[in-house]
Amino acid sequence: MASGRRAPRTGLLELRCGAGSGAGGERWQRVLLSLAEDALTVSPADGEPGPEPEPAQLNGAAEPGAAPPQLPEALLLQRRRVTVRKADAGGLGISIKGGRENKMPILISKIFKGLAADQTEALFVGDAILSVNGEDLSSATHDEAVQALKKTGKEVVLEVKYMKEVSPYFKNSAGGTSVGWDSPPASPLQRQPSSPGPQPRNLSEAKHVSLKMAYVSRRCTPTDPEPRYLEICAADGQDAVFLRAKDEASARSWAGAIQAQIGTFIPWVKDELQALLTATGTAGSQDIKQIGWLTEQLPSGGTAPTLALLTEKELLFYCSLPQSREALSRPTRTAPLIATSSAHRLVHSGPSKGSVPYDAELSFALRTGTRHGVDTHLFSVESPQELAAWTRQLVDGCHRAAEGIQEVSTACTWNGRPCSLSVHIDKGFTLWAAEPGAARAMLLRQPFEKLQMSSDDGTSLLFLDFGGAEGEIQLDLHSCPKTMVFIIHSFLSAKVTRLGLLA
């Protein structure tokens, strides 16, 4: 990592390695996860895989005479930033030794089970504390370090580095020989030992996933309803990892940190794609309004990451981040905004048996009117903020498209006569005669304000009721009328919004 960058966030999670004979039929390997500015690194960590690791395995010696933990090489080589969130009682849950007067750095000599430091799964006996909330402790005395740690609030950011050469000194520290500043836990939280699972095919070397427009999603599994799983995929779809955290809070914290780092790349990605989009010269290649990953709920019950790119007129979908003009010009699916509507908080029967559950409160449906009917797709996002942003952008995009297009025409038949129906956002509905060789004649004109109801038969017929003498007129559009129905609704919605803004 280049000098000058902040220390990465690190912690121990579990990596799914493949099928096995244990619970859930899956094999898991304990790994060290390191979140840097531009990449997520998964490194091998020693220890048997299991659904709930013991604190002693994660944080160092917990019994008198126990040996210090065997830590992954990647952890020995780097400075790390660890955020500790203290409970109302119990403090950080560490003891320290060393100090300038002892010609030693400030070292963690003991970690109490169940307290805040232990729960991070990212601090170890033998870690040197380099700073506390940005305050340098590299030359602090023991008392200065104690005071710096005591005056912290509920959230403490420690910068640490593991000191392999001094960790044997604390081999028997759990027996009570350490001099600590934190009160020992009154009633330490106990965790039940986990039965080791079958030996997986271990990760043999570090795996790096670029964070540039990467996809990250919190998940459940059919055998574990707690959303403590993370799926992370590189933007090109080539590198992917499926991780298990100790609980939902840990998974949420990691997902938030990873998403925040990914978010720093979005302005650059938008600029790159904007240049490619402009170079394609295709219709609708205006400014990019929004870009991001959605999780599509497939009809089979599974899910798939889908990259959505919103322009002024279209919503484009890709399986991976386009890297060329050719890739950008070939989306897997395109939805014209003027014929698309969105809805969320749907009432549904839930995912099918064996599928990955998802949060219906963070889901929304996209419905697009086409010549073959209504094309419906269900997506989910990771946070209420994402849902609000996509919903707002889609509604605004629909209105922008309506205001930009202004008018749409289609061939039809009315009372047996070939006609052309024009729908204009300001002028309303106009029927023109379209007999071969005949002069263009206006047969009917009605403003939007006169429209009392519209409906269709889902096959070819469009019904427009203007009241008055004409009543309901029936138009045969010779194909599924859903596209025109959605466009009429978009014009109406844009007009209502316009009136609301002017009121």
Swiss-Prot record:
InterPro entries: PDZ (IPR001478), PDZ_sf (IPR036034), PH-like_dom_sf (IPR011993), PH_domain (IPR001849), PHsplit_syntrophin (IPR041428), Syntrophin (IPR015482), Syntrophin_4th (IPR055108). Transmembrane segments: none annotated. Residues 81-164 form the PDZ domain. GO terms for cellular component: anchoring junction; cytoplasm; cytoskeleton; postsynaptic membrane; protein-containing complex; sarcolemma. GO terms for molecular function: actin binding; calmodulin binding; structural molecule activity; transmembrane transporter binding. The modification Phosphoserine is found at S95, S178, S183, S187, S194. Residues 481-503 are annotated as: Calmodulin-binding. The keyword Manganese does not apply. Keywords: Actin-binding, Calcium, Calmodulin-binding, Cell junction, Cell membrane, Cytoplasm, Cytoskeleton, Membrane, Phosphoprotein, Repeat. The keyword Transcription does not apply. SMART domains: PDZ (SM00228), PH (SM00233). GO terms for biological process: neuromuscular junction development; regulation of vasoconstriction by circulating norepinephrine. High expression in skeletal muscle. Expressed at intermediate level in heart, kidney and brain, and at low level in intestine, liver, lung and testis. Disulfide bonds: none annotated. Residues 447-503 form the SU domain. Residues 40-68, 177-203 are annotated as: Disordered. It is a peripheral membrane protein. Belongs to the syntrophin family. Monomer and homodimer. Interacts with MAPK12, TGFA, GA and F-actin. Interacts with the other members of the syntrophin family: SNTB1 and SNTB2; with dystrophin protein DMD and related proteins DTNA and UTRN; SGCG and SGCA of the dystrophin glycoprotein complex; NOS1; GRB2; calmodulin and the sodium channel proteins SCN4A and SCN5A. Interacts with MYOC; regulates muscle hypertrophy. Interacts with DTNB. The PH 1 domain mediates the oligomerization in a calcium dependent manner, and the association with the phosphatidylinositol 4,5-bisphosphate. The PDZ domain binds to the last three or four amino acids of ion channels and receptor proteins. The association with dystrophin or related proteins probably leaves the PDZ domain available to recruit proteins to the membrane. Adapter protein that binds to and probably organizes the subcellular localization of a variety of membrane proteins. May link various receptors to the actin cytoskeleton and the extracellular matrix via the dystrophin glycoprotein complex. Plays an important role in synapse formation and in the organization of UTRN and acetylcholine receptors at the neuromuscular synapse. Binds to phosphatidylinositol 4,5-bisphosphate. This is Alpha-1-syntrophin.
